[in-house]
């Protein structure tokens, strides 16, 4: 009996190494794009406590030193700007040390409520409940205008809350943060600062 010739059909063309590299690169690009989109969404959600991005404020010191108590049914929020020093900065580095007139916008639940400039403070009434506070450095320098700090808290009727925003210069960078301080520290910061009056620029 004559042998039967068996022919096998090719399973498919083998991919070249360049095609495999191209596919891997495409997967990485898609992954990076997805991660970037998620990062942007998370950033937008975090900044939702602030106000409109393009809003600008002007701040003037006030001769009075007002320290009111909460009105009925409300909490009272003090926000104090605390400027630090940079002992390690070179004396001639004006860029690093020039934060004494830093203007910071203060937002609450997506609305700008005021601003501080220099060692100053202001206050505002707030309904009880959970709230989200935001500060943003208003500056013509892009790196500084991207400085944000956030805090969330639950306000109680009749309570007074003191938030300290700190701007500390550095030789090549800076510290920009926001924290809730105890009432003793808060009262000291308010007593050591100038009351500021701010309004949105048209």
Model-predicted segments: where are they?
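Short loop/turn and low-complexity linker motifs enriched in small/turn-promoting residues
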Residues: 38-202
């Amino acid at each position: 009996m004559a042998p039967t010739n068996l022919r096998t059909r090719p399973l498919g063309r083998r991919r070249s190494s360049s095609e495999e590299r191209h596919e891997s690169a495409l997967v990485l690009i898609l992954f990076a794009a997805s991660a970037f989109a998620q990062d942007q969404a998370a950033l937008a959600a975090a900044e939702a406590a602030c106000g409109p991005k393009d809003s600008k404020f002007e701040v003037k010191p006030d001769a009075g030193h007002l320290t009111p108590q909460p009105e009925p049914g409300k909490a009272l929020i003090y926000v104090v700007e605390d400027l630090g020093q940079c002992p390690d900065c070179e004396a001639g580095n004006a860029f690093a040390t020039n934060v004494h007139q830093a203007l910071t916008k203060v937002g609450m639940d997506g609305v700008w409520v005021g601003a501080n400039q220099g060692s100053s403070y202001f206050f505002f009434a707030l309904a009880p409940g959970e709230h989200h506070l935001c500060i943003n450095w208003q500056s013509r320098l892009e790196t500084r205008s991207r400085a944000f700090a956030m805090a969330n808290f639950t306000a109680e009727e009749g309570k007074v809350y003191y938030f300290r925003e700190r701007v500390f210069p550095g030789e090549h960078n800076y510290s920009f943060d926001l924290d809730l301080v105890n009432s003793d520290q808060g009262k000291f910061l308010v007593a050591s600062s100038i009351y500021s009056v701010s309004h949105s620029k048209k």
